[in-house]
């Protein structure tokens, strides 16, 4: 579904830059007449905007979607800045060399004309875009949120929209606060609503469930970390899902040792209060 969301983000930037929606609504409001084309030529200046080519785009979160947005924006002539302190090796290899990978998110707030968020919703990221962050942004910034609804402090956002600090807010999450707020473009969660995305998601879900059942590997879980020990081709493998508390690993290894089982390889990953343990090549 990453490509479907990427296309929505690009569409959102274009719609926020040029008042295409306003122009369409104006045209539909006009009575059919022979001089409609002439009238449109006269009124079109009301809907003028700017091009995104040459503008600075800041991307917070360089996962599957963030990387696709970054690479596509480069091809559209944008100057792209990416921030992700936890970027994966695969994502890093997929990024265009023309993308500036920065170490402080404040640089994005300070310098970028467009800012798009692509991070998971955690306690640490809830309302990550608030009054202080918005205050650091350029006047007239365009903010896009196609990740999670609660990443943005909407009270602070609405105030910034009214004051003109934020030029446009584009989001895929409809709620009563932003749906009728000024200078917002709100879509009804259409990011992955394409035939291709739905097919790809179904195939991906089946493949990842099979990988877990056959190999114990976890990918794209909501409450567990990605944990990949490859295919299970050894004598055996034990996968243990457990609470992320001290001394758990020592208990597992002692239990196996007492049973006369030797562990040749072991992988442990944690996410929040949950962990997964792989022990493989049991002897």
Give each language-model segment a name.
Residues 1-56, 220:
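Phosphate-binding beta-alpha-beta segment of Rossmann-like dinucleotide-binding domains, i.e.
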Residues 219-281:
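A conserved regulatory-domain signal marking ACT and ACT-like small-molecule sensing domains
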Residues 72-73, 137:
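Aromatic pocket-lining residues of Rossmann-like dinucleotide-binding sites
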Residues 167, 179-221:
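Adenosine-phosphate binding glycine-rich loop
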Residues 85-177, 193:
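Rossmann-like adenosine-cofactor binding region
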Residues 66-67:
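N-terminal Rossmann-fold NAD(P) dinucleotide-binding loop
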Residues 55, 62-63:
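Glycine-rich Rossmann-fold phosphate-binding loop(s) that bind the pyrophosphate
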Residues 6-25, 73-78, 203-217, 253-257:
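Oxidoreductase and adenylate-handling cofactor-binding alpha/beta cores
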């Amino acid at each position: 579904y990453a490509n479907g969301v990427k296309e929505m983000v690009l569409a959102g930037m274009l719609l926020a830059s040029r008042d295409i929606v306003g122009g369409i609504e104006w045209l539909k409001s006009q009575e059919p007449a022979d001089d409609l084309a002439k009238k449109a030529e006269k009124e079109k200046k009301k809907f003028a905007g700017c091009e995104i080519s040459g503008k600075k785009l800041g991307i917070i979160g360089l996962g599957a979607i963030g990387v696709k947005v970054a690479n596509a924006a480069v091809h559209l002539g944008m100057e792209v800045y990416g921030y992700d302190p936890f970027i994966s090796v695969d994502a890093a290899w997929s990024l265009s060399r023309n993308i500036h990978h920065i170490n402080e998110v404040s640089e994005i707030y300070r310098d970028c004309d467009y800012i798009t968020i692509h991070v998971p919703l955690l306690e640490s990221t809830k309302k990550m875009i608030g009054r202080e962050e918005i205050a650091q942004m350029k006047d007239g910034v365009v903010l896009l949120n196609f990740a999670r609804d609660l990443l943005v402090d909407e009270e602070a956002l609405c105030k910034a929209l009214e004051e003109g600090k934020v030029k446009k807010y584009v989001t895929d999450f409809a709620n009563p606060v932003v749906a009728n707020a000024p200078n917002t473009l709100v879509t009804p969660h259409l990011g992955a609503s394409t035939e291709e995305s739905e097919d790809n998601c179904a195939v991906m879900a089946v493949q990842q469930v099979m990988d877990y059942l056959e190999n114990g590997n976890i990918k794209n879980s909501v409450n567990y970390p990605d944990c990949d020990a490859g295919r299970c081709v050894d004598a055996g493998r034990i996968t243990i899902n457990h609470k992320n508390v001290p001394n758990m690993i020592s208990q597992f290894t002692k239990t196996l040792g007492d049973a006369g089982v030797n562990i040749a390889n072991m992988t442990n990953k944690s996410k929040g209060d949950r962990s997964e343990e792989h022990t493989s090549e049991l002897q």
